[in-house]
Amino acid sequence: MRNAGALVTEDVLRTLVLATYLLGVKRILIMPHTNCRMAMGEEADIHALIQKEHGVDTRSLEFRTVSDQRAALITDVNRVRSYPLLNDGVVVGGAIYDVTSGKITTVDC
């Protein structure tokens, strides 16, 4: 699954519950990437950019920008690991993908 910012939302958790029970998913990897637009500015900056370039006021939406990808990743991995409705025994890990080098760096969560 992919979403803006690679953040674990309620919808992501719902989907992971379904995946672990109905599809037999046994491993989950949360992996944001470098140069992510959601980690390159403040929420207000993104709203302003969309307004300026497209004339659309998006301030009613929360984009959930990330100021520290590593910290957000650790929080999200631990959130998934501790989610009570996930199937027992699911392994959850985290890594960051460097889009320039292609390197994947695991993160101890």
Which residues fall in each region the model found?
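Divalent metal-coordination and catalytic microenvironments
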Residues: 1, 30, 102
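Short strand-loop junctions, especially beta-strand C-caps/beta-turns
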Residues: 3-4, 33
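Divalent-metal-activated hydrolytic enzyme cores
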Residues: 5-11, 18-23, 37-109
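Ordered, amphipathic secondary-structure segments that act as subunit-interaction surfaces
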Residues: 24-33
